[in-house]
Structure formats: structure tokens, C-alpha cells
Amino acid sequence: MEEQKSIKETLQQGASGDKTKKKLVIKKKAAPSDEKKESSPGAQGQTTATEAKQSSPASSDKKKDLNELIREEAKRQGLGSGPQAPSQASPIVSRPDRKPEPLPQPDREKAPMDRKPESILSGDTSSPNFRSGGGQGGGNQGYFRKEDRNPIVSRPTTPRPPRPEGQTGGGYQGNRGPGQGGGYQGNRGPGQGGPGGYQGNRGPGQGGPGGYQGNRGPGQGGPGGYQGNRGPGQGGPGGYQGNRGPGQGGPGGYQGNRGARPIGQGGPGSGRPPGDAPFGAPGGLPGAGGPGGAKKRVFDKEKGGREENENTKFFKQSFRKQKAQAAALAAVPKEISILENIQVGEIAKKLNLKPGEVISKLMKMGMMVTINNVIDAETASILADDYGCKVKIVSLYDETVIEEEKDAPEDYITRPPVVTIMGHVDHGKTKLLDTIRSSRVAEGESGGITQHIGAYQVETERGKIAFLDTPGHEAFTSMRARGASVTDIVVLVVAADDGVMPQTIEAINHAKEAEVPIIVAVNKIDLPAANPEKVRQELSNYGLQPEEWGGTTIFCDISAKSNIGIDKLLEMLIIQAELLDHKANPKRKAKGTIVEAKLDPGRGAVATVLIQNGTLRVGDAFVAGVHAGRVRAMYDDLGRSIKEAGPSFPALVTGLDGVPDAGAPFDVVIDDKEARTISHSRQEYERLGQSKNAATRVTLDNMSEIIKQGALKELKVIIKADVRGSTEAVKEALEKLSTADVRLNVIHAGTGAIVDSDIILASASNAIVIGFHTRANPKTVSLAEKEKVEIKYYSIIYDVVNEVKASMEGMLEPEKVENIIGKVEIRDVFKISKVGNIAGCMVKSGKVTKQAHVRVISSETGEITWEGKIKNLKRMKDDVADVLTGFECGILLDGFNDFSVGDEIEAYEIREIARKL
């Protein structure tokens, strides 16, 4: 009865609005099947230490009666109707628009509970459901099973009245103004409000249970917050993963270090503003300070965070590096195109790699390089293969391809054939062309030998034919190869009296490589020694079977000198061209090939261009090899000025900024700007390909080779010729003369007249200057005499090769040849003091001279025991120069006395013979 009276007084005090008294304790009746009692969240958070002591020793029946009395008394007095009365027995209010939904009941066997309600109410911290830490009051709400928590009470069916200002319920993830309700993830303003906010800060006041993951301001509030800081107060159980401020509260928090409780009472009292709080629970008095240790926990957390960040940073950097490497490898193309030589920076760009990575790779391969060094194609292939990339070696012009135009099919017309005349030297190629043109071309050639390619267009009864006349000398291999590459038909001229020769075979190979048909012209059939059948037999061994023998090759017996069979040859050419049916579009920009180029004293750089497609006109901008220009004037093969040149027309073009290489492509472009851009790119690639600083592997073998090469004898020359093709031919012929003992080094090769710069270069490098079909002016000749530079002029390539060869042979060390001149037998040995042993000899064969070299051969072993010179030779008592066969003589050797009777002395001479290349 005393307990009932105490409770009654408590309820009356709460109804009268006394804020400083103890909180109302409301217990919910447990289900009959439950073995344990559970208090509501509000009651747990607001149970004082005195009430916990009063309720802990009571029996189960007594508690049941007490709870019923509390509920009946609360209903009778109508709590919540007054301005200061608490709103509900439970902080979770019912809602009128929804039916109550009971919480699911978990299986008790799966979640056993070894504590008793008494231990909760009494603040027993020895229970395994609590962590260590001081304080009394309610336990940690996060540790209770769902079935032990206060279930949601039924909600009234009547409509819910609007909330007045100051009484608003808790918001969700927002800021909560001053009032009573519990907010969720928001800041809770000061007031008496209901349950604690979730993940938000709770302002000072007397409110309900603690917030979740938020800070709780000072006050007397309910249970501790979750993952947040709790302000000073008397509140309930400790927070979860957060720091608990000073207060009297319940058991310690979770996952936090809880230090010793500070001395003294809790923080300030309630800061509740005036007004109704129907949804809030009454606040309590400030209690003793809560557990400390927050700073230590934060320090440990921050320290661990720093260590984790350092490790994470290391692994992230490694991961990023591996990812970058994988991305770099993925960016490497499957195939790249390069020239014979390529810069390190350029190949790195083609491989989509950083130059530093490529340099590092090359250094591992034993090559000391920088970004500007040049490596050869072989090294580049090995480097690219390590990255899974294939290398394709291309020419200079493949690297700078000019975009092709699209031709309309209706614009195509049949173009005249391009015929190249090939064969061995002096087999009558130029004479044949002379007969066809009815001109005197052959007489204009030096020595009757063609020195460069001639391009002509001939008008016949059956149509036009473009002819290219190539040199037959072995030095002009490159010219013949170019002629075969731009031609449609090859006419192979073979002399009937001479048969197949080396250049004949070479011409056959060039034509087969170019995949062009061959028509054989058997020339000089009017000579008595002519044997056309022998020529057919020899050519059949090289795959050229005559049609009359069942083959596919056309043979024409002709005589260029007597004009025999020429018409038949032209007819065969036209028939073959009709079968090939080559087309071209005269409406497009011109495209062709440089047949020949030279530096003309009056017109500058000029080039013979064979137009293969399109039409070339005066004023067109073009790119010729590595040079650019604009057509200033054009001339035909007879020297007449023309305005345009169509397909299969050879034209002489002026307006180039340099002398292009023979065989270089000729392309008309849009304007001068594009021409210069392409020209500069090609010149850069050309310099790169000719670079002398190509990196090499650093090995002892290379060093030995360099040392050996330094001892080589070397002849240095500078070559100047009238046309580029002749320059190439002379250079190629001379470079073939190099041997292991003497080497020919072409310092410079160019076209045009010999100028002062050539003389200065020759003087500095100790070279001779060779002029082929070109000369030096008087001023340059005077400079050469002053600098003591030799200039040689030639018009026939035979003379160039023979004289240079003789000069190189003179640089060779002569070959020493041993010649035995006599043999002498030793028949006696005379010992003379102060002189030595003298051999008494008989000359058995030849003769022995005082100047001869001799060797002593032992009669016992047959081995040579000594070699040297004769010091003195005597016949009787007289000194003699030589002794012939059958005569006796005395021989004193220079420095040798250990010979015996029966030994043989062999006399020989050493002659020096000039070596040949």
C-alpha cells in the first residue's frame, strides 16, 4: 500500500506540472508466455536510480499489480489534458489513420537472453548484455532483442489534430525546430520533446530517448544516443559508437572507450522553453557526470586512420601504376610503319609510349641513347616485338602518302603504252630508238654509250608510243630497275652475234620483278656472225619461250642499222598494248614519275617527268620527291614549249626548288602551301634516314672493329655529274671497288657544275673531285690549284672506274713473292778466330749472290735452323758478288755459326708485286 501511495503522489505531482520532480514510471504488462518483463523505451530512459532500487526486489505478482494500478490511475486522472501533463505513457504515440501493426516476434531459442528484467531495472552491470562501465539506470537499448522492447501501441481511430507551434513531432533528416518531437538524422532544437533524433544533434532539454549517430545536448533526457556525443545529464543508457557526456546514465556505450567518471554532478538542467509538450516526456534532474574517455577513443581512431591511409596510399599508388602500365600496353598498336632509320622519340610516338620508357628499354638492350638518337630498323623491330607490335619497313614516300582522288568511270580513256628498251651495252638499244625516231640520238652520246635515261614519245601509224631508253652498262642497274618499274612493256634487245650477256639477264630479272611483258628484239641479224636461233635457245633457259616453240614470248628479228623488221616490232607493241588496255583519267590532277633530273645552268633544276595519270599544266603546284615547286615551263622531247602534258607523255619541267632523285614520285597538289608542307616532311624523313649518329650496341667487338677500320687505307672522292641518275651510277660503280684493304669513301655526290664549296670540302677531307659531264669555272679552278685539290673530268663511265681503280691499287701494300735462286751444299767448316765459322760450299743449282736471303736446312731433320743474310761471299780469296752452279765458295753468315757438314743453304730473293683489286 505504501508503494501504491507513493505512485499516486508521483502521478499527482506530474499532473500539477512540477518539472523538477521525478519522472513518471509506466510499465507495460508482458504477455503471459513471456518469462521476462520489459519496460518501454521512454520508461527505460527516464527511470531514476531510486525507482530502480524500489522495483528490483519486488516479486512477479507484486509488479503485475503495481503496473495495473499505474495504468488505472493514469486513466482516472486523465494525464495529458493539462498544459504541463505528460502526453502518453509511451513515447511512441498511436496514429489515427493506420491500424496497429504488431512487431514480429523472433524465435527465443535462437536468441537466448540470460538476463532478467530485474537486472535491467536495478542497473545490474554484471549482466553479459552490458559492456564495462559505471553508472546506473536503463541499459543500452541497442542490445535488447526486439521482443523485449516496448511494442507499438494501438493507434486511435479518431483524426489527428494539427500540431500547434512548439509541439511538432520529429522530422526526418531535417532540422527540427524548438519543440518536443524526436527528429531523424536532423538537429533537434531545445525542448522537452519526444524520442531522440537519429544521426542528428540533439539540443539541450529534457527530451526523450537519445538520438542516433548524433550529438545530444545537455539536459536530462532519455537513453543514450547512437554513434553520437551525449551532453551532460542524468540520461539513460550509454550511446552506441559514440561518446557519452558526463551524467549519471546507464551502462557503457558500444565500440567506444569509456574512461573514468569525472568527479561532480552533471551538466546544467533543462532548457525547455515555455509551452505545451504533449509529445515529450518530462525531463529529469542533472545527475552525476558520465563516463569519460572520449578523447582517447578519438585519438586511437585518428591514429589508426593515419596508418590505414598510409597503407592505402601505397597500395593505391601501386595499383595505379599497374593500371597505367596495362593501359600503356593496351594502347600499343599491332603494327607500325618505319623507315630504315628512326629517332627514339619518333618510335615512342608510334608505339604510344613515353620516350623515357623506350629509352630505358634500349639501355637494357645495351644502347646508350637519347630522345634524338637514331636507331636502325632491326633494333626498332626488336624493341617493338617486346611490346607485341610488328614493324613494317616502308619507303620515304610511303610515310608521306598524298591522298588519291576518286575518278569517275566515265572519265577514263585508253592511254598510250610506255615501252622501255633494255639490254646489254653495245647491243644496239639507242640505235633502235634512233631508227624509230628517225633522228641522230646515238651520235650525241659520249663514246656511243647511253649515260642516262632518255624519254621520248613517237607517233606511229597505229598510235602514240612512249619510249624509255635505259643504259646498258653494269653501273646503271638502278636506272634499269626504275625503267622497268614505270613501264608497260619491255623490249629486250639482244645482239644476234653476241647472245645473252650479264646485263641481258639482269634486264630479264627486272622485267619479271615488275611483272611486265617482254618482247625480244634480236638485233644485228644482218651481220655474218648472227645466230638468232642461238639467242632463242639461250633465252629459253631463262623462261622466255618463243611463240613458234609453243611459248608466250614474242621474238622479232631486226636490224636497227639496216631498218629491218622495225615495222613488225612496232605492230607487236601496239597489239600488246591493246591487250593490256591501260586506262587513265586526263581530268584529274597529274601524277607521274621523275625519269631524270639535273641542274641546268640557265634554267635551274629541271626534271623529265613521265605523266602516268591526269594532266599536268603550266602553273600547277607539285611535289617531286623531297622537293616542291610550281610548273614555270614545260618542253617536249624535241625541246618545244608546251602548255600541258597528258597521260604517257614525257615532259621536261622547270620550276623545282631542288634536283629530285630519279624514280621519285611526282604529284600535283592543291597549292604551294601543301607542296611545301609535304616537301618539308619528306626532307625531315630523308635526313633521318641518312643520319650518321645511329646508335649502336656498346660491345668490345664493335670497338675492335672501329680500331681495325682506322688502319684501313681510304680514297676519298667527291662526285659531281650533270644528272641525278648519272651521279647514282658513278657512285654505285665506284663504291663496288672497296675491299678489305682499301676503301673508297664518297664524301659528297651531287649534280651540277663543280663549285667553290666542293673544292673547300675536298681540301678539308683530302679528297679528289670527279666531274662527270660537268666542269668547274675558271674561278673554281684557281681555288683548286691554290688548295692543291685534284679535279678529274670524265665523259665515259669506263674511264672513271678504271682510273679510280688504278689509284686504289696504288694505295695497296705490294704483295711479296719469294723466288729461290740457288742451292748450296756445305762440305766443310772452317773455324777462324775473331771471324767465326766459314762454310766451304759447292753450288749445286742456280746461283748464290751476296745480296740474297738464305736459310740453313739441317741434313738430319730437314728443318730450317736459321734464316738471314750473307755477311761475306768469297771465291778462293776474292770477294765476289755471286757464284754460279758448279763452283766452290766460302760463305760467312751474318750471326750464325752452328751449321754442320752436309747441311744445305738455300738462297732466295723477295720481289714486290703490285696488287690488283
UniProtKB/Swiss-Prot annotation:
Keywords: Cytoplasm, GTP-binding, Initiation factor, Nucleotide-binding, Protein biosynthesis
Comp. bias (Basic residues): 20-30
Entries under InterPro entries matching the protein: EF-G-like_DII (IPR053905), IF2_II (IPR044145), IF2_N (IPR006847), P-loop_NTPase (IPR027417), Small_GTP-bd (IPR005225), T_Tr_GTP-bd_dom (IPR000795), TF_IF2_bacterial-like (IPR000178), TIF_IF2 (IPR015760)
Sequence segments annotated as region (G4): 523-526
Segments of this protein annotated with the region G1: 423-430
Disordered: region residues: 1-312
Record Gene3D superfamilies: P-loop containing nucleotide triphosphate hydrolases (3.40.50.300), Translation factors (2.40.30.10), Translation initiation factor IF- 2, domain 3 (3.40.50.10050)
Domain tr-type G: 414-587
GO CC, one annotated term: cytosol
S-S pairs: none
Stretches for region G3: 469-472
Presence of the UniProt keyword Chaperone in the record: no
Bias-annotated ranges (Gly residues): 132-141, 167-256, 281-293
Composition bias type Basic and acidic residues, residue spans: 60-76, 95-118, 297-312
Subcellular location: Cytoplasm
Gene Ontology MF term list: GTP binding; GTPase activity; translation initiation factor activity
Sequence ranges of Polar residues compositional bias: 41-59
Region (G5): 559-561
Region feature G2, mapped onto this chain: 448-452
Residue numbers binding GTP: 423-430, 469-473, 523-526
Top-level taxon of origin: Bacteria
UniProt similarity note: Belongs to the TRAFAC class translation factor GTPase superfamily. Classic translation factor GTPase family. IF-2 subfamily.
PANTHER family in the record: TR-TYPE G DOMAIN-CONTAINING PROTEIN, TRANSLATION INITIATION FACTOR IF-2-RELATED
Physiological role: One of the essential components for the initiation of protein synthesis. Protects formylmethionyl-tRNA from spontaneous hydrolysis and promotes its binding to the 30S ribosomal subunits. Also involved in the hydrolysis of GTP during the formation of the 70S ribosomal complex.
Name the UniProt record assigns to this protein: Translation initiation factor IF-2
